[in-house]
């Protein structure tokens, strides 16, 4: 695969994603057929049929993991390893700094929503349930943060950044990151019989939200700003851990916010999100994310020149 070796790493990522999607479309109908067989013949193992959208999502995860294991040497090169293999003290400091900034910004947003009557604070769950929710949310936050930071910042953004056009890197990588979050499968339905090509129309239907793009714009913009801050964290520190902490902290906070209260209405307004994803699509959230970016700037000011020089040296 000499052509793959000569290809810039961010282009390898695009081809990898296309390959994962193609493999998902091929195997998902057969996985759905197998799941239906289990539900029919072994109800003790699988009590009910699984909608095809869920099967497709699991097939995507399986395809991604398998192909990444097989092709990992084309993505995890020396430059990527240097973003991960840092001293434990540095990694832990950056990780917990990111977590603190992200959770702190979400607490401030929750206070603002409480003051404006959008959020009512109260303890909705028992202590044991709350602790269980915290644990699962933290595991989800760290795993999602680590994977997305590796792919979108470590590979895609850094690949573009290393080519010298930094503005293009910030815009292209994070626009791709934000738009990709709105590629969603259609409504739940079940496959009847063997339909070997069912995965391909299902994939096409996942792009249906873009037929009405205007409601998506606030959410896309909010995720774009998040991507900018996470990319800036990579440039300022020269590693992925501050970004993983920020990313994981935001995911953790969103998943646990309703443990401590509930929203008083469905539409959170222009300040906190009138469209999905709620909160991320709100103007107040955009400002809080930018403030986190400012905090990243000042907290890393003693390391910034050294990290920038290091990134530039690795790109040459």
Predicted features along the sequence, with ranges:
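N-terminal, membrane-interfacial amphipathic/helix-forming hydrophobic leader that caps
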Residues: 1-92, 97, 107-110, 114-119, ...
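Helix-boundary and loop/linker segments of multi-pass membrane transporters
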Residues: 5-9, 86-89, 125-132, 161-164, ...
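Alpha-helical transmembrane segments and their helix-entry boundary regions
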Residues: 83, 94-95, 155, 169-170, ...
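Residue-level signature of the transmembrane alpha-helical core
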Residues: 95, 99, 103, 138, ...
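Membrane-interface helix/loop boundary segments of multi-pass membrane proteins
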Residues: 147-179, 183-197, 235-239
């Amino acid at each position: 695969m000499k052509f793959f070796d000569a290809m810039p790493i961010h282009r390898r990522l695009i081809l990898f994603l296309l390959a994962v999607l193609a493999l998902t479309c091929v195997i998902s109908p057969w996985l759905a057929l197998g799941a239906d067989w289990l539900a029919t013949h072994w109800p003790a193992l699988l009590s009910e049929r699984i909608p095809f959208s869920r099967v497709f999502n699991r097939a995507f995860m399986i395809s991604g993991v398998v192909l990444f294991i097989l092709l990992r040497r084309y993505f995890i090169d020396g430059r990527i390893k240097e973003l991960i293999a840092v001293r434990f003290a540095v990694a832990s400091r950056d990780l917990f700094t990111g977590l603190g900034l992200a959770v702190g910004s979400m607490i401030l947003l929750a206070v603002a929503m409480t003051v404006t009557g959008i959020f009512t604070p109260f303890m909705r769950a028992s202590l044991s349930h709350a602790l269980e929710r915290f644990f699962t949310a933290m595991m989800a936050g760290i795993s999602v943060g680590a994977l997305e930071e590796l792919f979108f910042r470590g590979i895609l953004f850094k690949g573009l950044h290393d080519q010298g056009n930094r503005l293009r890197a910030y815009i292209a990588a994070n626009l791709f990151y934000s738009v990709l979050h709105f590629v969603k499968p259609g409504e739940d339905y079940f496959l009847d019989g063997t339909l070997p090509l069912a995965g391909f129309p299902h994939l096409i239907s996942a792009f249906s939200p873009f037929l009405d793009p205007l409601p998506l714009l606030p959410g896309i913009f909010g995720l774009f700003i998040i991507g900018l801050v996470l990319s800036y964290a990579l440039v300022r520190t020269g590693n992925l851990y501050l970004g993983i902490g920020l990313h994981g902290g935001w995911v953790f906070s969103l998943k646990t916010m309703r443990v401590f209260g509930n929203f008083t209405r469905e539409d959170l307004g222009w300040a906190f999100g009138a469209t999905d994803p709620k909160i991320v699509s709100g103007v107040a959230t955009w400002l809080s994310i930018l403030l986190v970016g400012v905090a990243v700037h000042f907290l890393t000011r003693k390391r910034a020149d050294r990290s920038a020089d290091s990134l530039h040296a690795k790109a040459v």
